[in-house]
């Protein structure tokens, strides 16, 4: 049963043949104290990897349960002064600020990837990012992110930045389609939910098969949107561009949006990378990215940029952050500061170098909904008794100002 699905494409072509080869570049670049601090405080705060790490006097070996040989051995620097310089493809804000200034172009030379989250268009409903709000209208986040990215690209380029968008249309970047992923989805479902295949009271073999097939199709679509598409975007960037920063663009929403309900709340959210859940840290697909991100040391740059953007959003919108703090899924970067937190999501995991996830506004707040449905426009219009400009331009200008404050010269 369920055998014989032909896979016309898979994720294998998008994944590195040796996902651990990068470790060699970081030999002797980090002390044990720094490694442990970054691992336990930021990247593996829930302890998923602790039993798989074996320490010697000057090195650590990573060998998860069930593997015959270690996946890598990392030698530590004896002290900070003796640490080798870690290789990186991106420049820090300080390095960019030291470059010769260009009049009227404060971001000259800055290389930015813009990744408008989700897809939109005819894919919006399939990716479950299309919501009809009674009395308002339908909102598709993938389309909103595209509008924002186009405005942001124009503004950044006018200030001298080089900008590479991961997409400019409401079509998937990947050539993979759900039909190509049925075997993989079936295998993952068998591994994670073996009970799902058991006969339920009142079921026939035919109805059980139909239930399983529907679920496998759903899982294949999930793999496409949450994994294959993100891998394709990051591969596209690696093949054509070397960014100093990647900005991932989303709009947020409260849980009430699931069934099209509005909320009186309206807040902003900003993420940097980290905070792998225990089950995420145990997943072989994600482990190489965890250690790459830890060793690449992009967190200080991510936090500096995200904090600047968050500050501008707070100034211009007056909105408070979603106060995640040290939660079941997130970790603070700085004690007592909640505007920016670390979280492991595909969009900031798969891109190399510093990645900032910008996720402002609650789409299901009535005023935000009306502004979104009004589209982009010149000047101001009245919303909820207030004169306000285009929400897309407000979003773009907040990001631009945040980047100028960090990188500008």
Where are these regions (language model features)?
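Bacterial N-terminal signal peptides
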Residues: 1-9
């Amino acid at each position: 049963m369920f055998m014989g699905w032909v896979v016309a494409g898979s994720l294998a072509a998008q994944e590195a043949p040796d996902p651990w080869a990068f470790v060699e570049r970081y030999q002797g670049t980090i002390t044990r104290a720094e490694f442990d601090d970054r691992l336990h405080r930021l990247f593996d705060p829930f302890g998923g990897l602790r039993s798989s790490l074996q320490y010697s006097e000057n090195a650590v070996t990573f060998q998860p349960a069930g593997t015959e040989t270690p996946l890598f051995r990392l030698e530590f620097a004896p002290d900070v002064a003796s640490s080798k310089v870690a290789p990186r493809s991106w420049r820090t804000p300080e390095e960019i600020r030291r470059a010769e200034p260009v009049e009227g172009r404060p971001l000259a030379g800055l290389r930015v990837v813009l990744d408008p989250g989700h897809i939109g268009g005819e894919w919006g409903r399939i990716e479950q990012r299309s919501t009809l709000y009674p009395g308002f209208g339908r909102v598709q986040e993938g389309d909103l992110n595209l509008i924002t990215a186009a405005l942001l690209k124009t503004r950044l380029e006018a200030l001298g930045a080089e900008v590479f968008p991961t997409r400019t249309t409401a079509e998937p970047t990947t050539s993979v389609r759900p039909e190509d992923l049925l075997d993989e989805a079936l295998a993952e479902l068998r591994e994670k939910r073996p009970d799902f295949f058991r006969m339920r009271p009142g079921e026939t073999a035919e109805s059980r098969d139909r239930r399983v097939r529907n679920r496998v199709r759903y899982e294949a679509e999930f793999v496409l949107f949450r994994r294959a598409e993100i891998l394709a975007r990051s591969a596209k960037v690696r093949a054509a561009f070397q960014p100093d920063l990647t900005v991932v663009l989303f709009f947020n929403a409260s849980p009430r949006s699931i069934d099209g309900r509005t909320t009186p709340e309206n807040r902003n959210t900003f993420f940097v990378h980290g905070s792998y859940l225990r089950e995420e840290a145990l997943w072989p697909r994600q482990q190489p990215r965890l250690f790459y991100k830890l060793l690449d040391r992009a967190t200080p740059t991510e936090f500096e940029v995200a904090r600047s953007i968050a500050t501008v959003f707070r100034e211009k919108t007056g909105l408070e952050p979603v106060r995640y703090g040290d939660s079941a899924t997130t970790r603070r970067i700085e004690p007592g500061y909640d505007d920016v937190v670390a979280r492991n999501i595909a969009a900031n995991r798969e891109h190399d170098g510093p990645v900032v996830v910008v996720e402002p506004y609650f789409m299901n707040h009535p005023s935000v909904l009306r502004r979104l449905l009004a589209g982009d426009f010149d000047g101001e219009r009245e919303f909820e008794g207030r004169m306000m400009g285009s929400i897309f331009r407000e979003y773009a200008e907040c990001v631009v100002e945040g980047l100028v404050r960090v990188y500008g010269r």
